A protein has these predicted regions:
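Short amphipathic alpha-helical segments
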Residues: 35, 148, 152
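Membrane-helix interface linkers and caps
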Residues: 53, 59-64
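Selective recognition of hydrophobic, aromatic-rich stretches within alpha-helical transmembrane segments
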Residues: 26-55, 81-117, 121, 159-193
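Interfacial aromatic "cap" segments that immediately flank transmembrane helices
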Residues: 1-27, 62-86, 98-149, 182-185, ...
Length: 193
């Protein structure tokens, strides 16, 4: 569980940037062209954190450099999701295994400037022998966060204030991003740096 003990503090250390970027991303989710760039920026944030760099504030997600990689991003995501969905149709387990094998492909695409196919191949090689660790780290984080989220949302629902419940959901999504970005940065650093 070293990944959790390193990843969560890394996310907390960069809380303001990750939290602010996530809130900005949620606010721009309905703007198509802009949202693709901000989605790429949010998804590739662990690369900077893996290098022990701090993104220069939450507004970094609006930089043009993220929108210029839209083609590669869509090709990679299309290839990955087609294969993962196809594998999941037959059984859930193959879909999970393939998604774990390619979990580092997006980071490799943008960090090492590989082609989408090479990024998927490299990710498969880097995660070989580490899939259980990645799976259980994600599972433990999801269960732990789920328990905390259910407790907090339960309190707001008991109070009966719908507005506060909606605000709590948005804040919980952003807080989940803080932990998951830190965890993904540690996984990427250990496997690919």
């Amino acid at each position: 569980m070293g990944i959790l003990t390193e990843g969560i503090p890394l996310g907390i250390k960069n809380f303001v940037t990750i939290f602010g970027a996530t809130i900005l991303w949620l606010l721009t989710i309905w703007i198509p062209y802009l949202n693709v760039g901000t989605t790429i920026a949010i998804n590739t944030m662990p690369i900077a954190l893996a290098d022990n760099e701090t993104p220069e504030g939450p507004t970094y997600i609006f930089k043009d450099k993220y929108r210029k990689y839209m083609g590669e991003y869509f090709v990679l995501m299309g290839l990955m999701y087609m294969a993962i969905w196809t594998a999941s149709i037959f059984l859930i387990i193959p879909g999970i295994v393939i998604s774990l094998a390619w979990s580092q492909a997006l980071y490799l695409l943008f960090d090492k400037h590989l082609t989408p196919m090479d990024a998927m191949k490299e990710s498969n090689e880097k995660t070989y022998g580490h899939k259980w660790t990645i799976f259980f780290t994600g599972l433990v984080f999801a269960i732990g966060f789920g328990i905390v989220a259910c407790f907090i949302l339960g309190i707001f629902m008991l109070i009966g204030v719908t507005f506060l419940t909606v605000i709590a959901v948005i804040l919980l999504i952003a807080l989940c991003m803080v932990g998951s970005v830190g965890i993904n940065a540690v996984i990427y650093r250990k496997l690919c740096k």
